[in-house]
């Protein structure tokens, strides 16, 4: 749980002594939320005191009439829609006729003024009518109705609460973190959270729950005063439906969405205590970075969302700040603790690493799959032992750390994909990698034993001063000095009771071989890792999932891609060469494929695993557009093709494709020979 949060238990209590205390506190005036919490202690609120408690919780008690300066003219272009929706709402309330007209005007005025003051275009899909329902039941005067509505919109309804909006991509990452199996199932059916939870979040459940249940949820939620807590309430509702969803695999996508969307409607008053208790448990098992890195979703901050941070739809998993990683493992007792897995090459790890980090060289995944499998097994055993022994390195939560350089972290992405495919819970990535860790330690000026951070970086090689040369220059002089002072304080890697365990598995994990040449460079990449990555991963066990459902590039193009019979294409008279292979995406995904070479073109046919013998035509490239074919000594089977245009001013790269090809030497030789024939023909 994030630092400084209050856990509100929801006890039940007989007797009304606390209710009298609450009433007296409210009557006395000047009562704050903390005082109310101490009195209420999460118990169900008396109906006659709810309005006063909510106004204090929303910080609008005693606030003036925001509508006083408004002319009251209802003249928005969408006014007819607003009026119609308000009228339908009034009809559902069964309000006495003499009060209906006044209430109708109040609600329509609140919505109209909010639209005008915030420059928002109204639509029925916004769920505002549902959001107003619990407030209307409090029988508030118009000024209080508006102030409460405004406060809820401002503090508790996230920005971009719409189809494909950022709040729902964040919710998917939370589901994946805690319930990877459920997340994977929904992903394979292409069911995104916005398809079923849009109105959960947009109405804070008021759209589906009875007024009594909604009031009970809001009683606890508003006292919690944590806008992110709604995510955990939504998660529990989803988890509660998990068993039903997973046992009804034959249901269509639409049936599953409809079932999920209506799940909150089955909640009863008796369920609310358990709902909050479970939500608080999941909340306590969630890294603080979930909130801190997304705080701008809520509130009136004017700070924009940086482009690099904005695209949560393409995130592989939750990202954890390096400051949280350092702080979390210093905590005693309960709380999120991380088992850090350093996926950098051996020479970088040996030059300097987080002292509590476990080394898993991601190169092994391609270089030596059997050793990689053994390394993973050893890693999980070491994690278990470190937790049992109370080691400072121990933690339930796996956090993978790369270098922080995108082209190198492609390998780490493949390792991450492996763990996510296995439905491993509590999987995250260290934001910014080891470079961010270096920078953070330099920024907090690790200088002197009193700060407690001097032991965090360790070296297992002789060249301690090589950290900066391995992981990039510091952007400024002070950072560089900070790192040098830090390097001078390096100590042994692990101060732990489980040293023997680490020694037993070190032969599998600590690859101290000669430096490996990287075959990827910054000029090689198209797009970025963590981008265009769909959430179901297919590495090694391709038969588990239909690859057309997971590849990022096929998500929008499936309907347009041509489906062909693989054998028919291989047997075509114009096909000169056929190479079975695996297409390797920037994210680390690999897909069973076939490269076919004709006199003038190279085709990639990607197998459709659920339809044996068939494939998509994934790419079609003219041989004369190949400007470069590369491989590296340590990964000779991983071939990179670069396509583009050559001119006097240089080479313009238009596309890059990578393939894992058995007997790659024969394949590249044949392709190069065919390219030369094409070029010779063009010249002549």
UniProtKB/Swiss-Prot annotation:
User: Bias category Polar residues: which stretches?
Assistant: 459-479
- Cell compartments where the protein resides: Golgi apparatus, trans-Golgi network; Cytoplasmic vesicle
Looking at the record, the residues that make up the Rhodanese domain are 334-446
Give GO terms for biological process.
brain development; embryonic brain development; neuron projection development; retrograde transport, endosome to Golgi; vesicle tethering to Golgi; vesicle-mediated transport
- Phosphothreonine occurs at 514
Report the SMART domains cross-referenced here: TBC (SM00164)
Keyword list, A-Z: Cytoplasmic vesicle, Developmental protein, Golgi apparatus, Phosphoprotein
Q: InterPro entries under this entry?
A: Rab-GAP-TBC_dom, Rab-GAP_TBC_sf, Rhodanese-like_dom, Rhodanese-like_dom_sf, TBC1D23, TBC1D23_C
> What is this protein's record name?
TBC1 domain family member 23
Source organism = Pongo abelii (Sumatran orangutan)
> Which lineage is the organism of this entry classified under, starting from the top rank?
Eukaryota, Metazoa, Chordata, Craniata, Vertebrata
This protein's gene is called TBC1D23
